[in-house]
Amino acid sequence: MVRLPYPFYEELDNSQKYEVFKYCWNDLDNTIILRKFLEPDIKLRIEMGRNYSADLRSKSDAQIAEVIFARELKWKHGIIADRPTIAPDYMFKYTVPDDVKFETKQLQDVLEVIRAAEFRLSEAGVVQMPDSIKSLNIKIADTIYTMGMGGLHSTESWMHYPEDTEYLIFDRDVASYYPRIILNQGLYPKHLTKHFLTIYNSVVERRLAAKESGDKLTANSLKIVINGSFGKFGSVYSILFSPDLLIQTTISGQLYLLMLIERLHLAGMTIISG
């Protein structure tokens, strides 16, 4: 993209008109390229819009998720979803699940720090990570891990690990990690009642089934709903706003990873990055 070569109010001579002509053609060419690039996303939004009687073409993934959950709650359960009213100084704690347990004293101490931590909302409605958690440097073997709103991160510098006849490197991912945590712990925005969980479970199960059967359109549509809804749990402007759910999910995800890392380490394996 390029800037307009002359002020829009300027009277142009013939040579300047030709420059504007080239500018317009450049705009058109790039618009066509952008349209082709976005075509799958546009088609997906049109199809989803038909299913939910809504024009979703200009909406982000998170906005689409919000519309769909609002529609499902109203159509299936008669619930009119409104934004919750939560005080700016709202404070809450993370609830440690029964299945989170550590073998080493170091990680048991980390768990107690997290159990005691108080989460608060800023005046803008953003969840603040407690300093006691932000300052944690969790050393397992030669790697240091930190916890944050965005997940668990290892702090290694540049490294090179070759695979050879003695060492194998494995890279594993978890399907629908956060959604499974939400479902397994029975989490839901309190103002939307447990009916939210019923709809959420249906979306996750339908998406996995579509992915398994090769139905890409349905799988991609429902992926938008799942991923988009999680982003809205932290937005004070959303009907899905639920700071407790957001923290319960993200902190649980990090603790489960630390449990896995600890067990692999105790079994004699090396964690390259997390």
What are these regions (language model features)?
Residues 1-4, 9-175, 263, 270-274:
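Conserved "right-hand" nucleotidyltransferase catalytic core of DNA-directed polymerases
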Residues 7-12, 134-274:
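Helical catalytic core of nucleic-acid polymerases
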